Amino acid sequence: MEKALVGITWEFVFQIVNTFIIFLLLRKLLFKPVLNIIESRENDIKSDLAEGEKAKNEGLALKKEYESKINFAKDEGQEIIKQATIRAEQKSDDIVNTAKKDALDIKEKANKDIEQERQKVINEIKNDISNIALLAASKVIEKDLDKSKHEELIENFIKEVGEAK
């Protein structure tokens, strides 16, 4: 018998049946486990992505929180510096005012001391002048004066000296 060039042979049918059986076996034994592995891997990747997104959002929230805390700290620091500057200026003003008051007190005391010293010197000069006048008058009169005459001469002399000024 001659074999046909194109035809279905038993070998070909067995190969197709064997291929189909191997396909079913592989599908039953390998396809589902591989599919489960792929599905598991896909779920792991999705959960990792979700965790990454969650961590990113938490990081952004923490960043915003830290930035707000930093801004608050900066504002608080500036307020502290401002208050310290105000207190320093007030203290400086108090010190300057106290120094001015002390200077005025010292100046007034010095003026008072000068006036007292001036009066003292004037009184000493008056006494010296009256002694000199008495001495000159006694030389002129050549006699001693009694106390009442002496005081009268002194007062007249002082009046004349005061008017001469």
From Swiss-Prot:
Keywords: ATP synthesis, Cell membrane, CF(0), Hydrogen ion transport, Ion transport, Membrane, Transmembrane, Transmembrane helix, Transport. SUPFAM superfamilies: F1F0 ATP synthase subunit B, membrane domain. It is a single-pass membrane protein. GO terms for cellular component: plasma membrane; proton-transporting ATP synthase complex. GO terms for molecular function: proton-transporting ATP synthase activity, rotational mechanism; proton-transporting ATPase activity, rotational mechanism. The chain crosses the membrane at residues 5-25. It is found in: Cell membrane. InterPro entries: ATP_synth_B-like_membr_sf, ATP_synth_b/b'su_bac/chlpt, ATP_synth_F0_bsu_bac, ATP_synthase_B_chain. It comes from the Bacteria. F-type ATPases have 2 components, F(1) - the catalytic core - and F(0) - the membrane proton channel. F(1) has five subunits: alpha(3), beta(3), gamma(1), delta(1), epsilon(1). F(0) has three main subunits: a(1), b(2) and c(10-14). The alpha and beta chains form an alternating ring which encloses part of the gamma chain. F(1) is attached to F(0) by a central stalk formed by the gamma and epsilon chains, while a peripheral stalk is formed by the delta and b chains. F(1)F(0) ATP synthase produces ATP from ADP in the presence of a proton or sodium gradient. F-type ATPases consist of two structural domains, F(1) containing the extramembraneous catalytic core and F(0) containing the membrane proton channel, linked together by a central stalk and a peripheral stalk. During catalysis, ATP synthesis in the catalytic domain of F(1) is coupled via a rotary mechanism of the central stalk subunits to proton translocation. Belongs to the ATPase B chain family. This is ATP synthase subunit b.
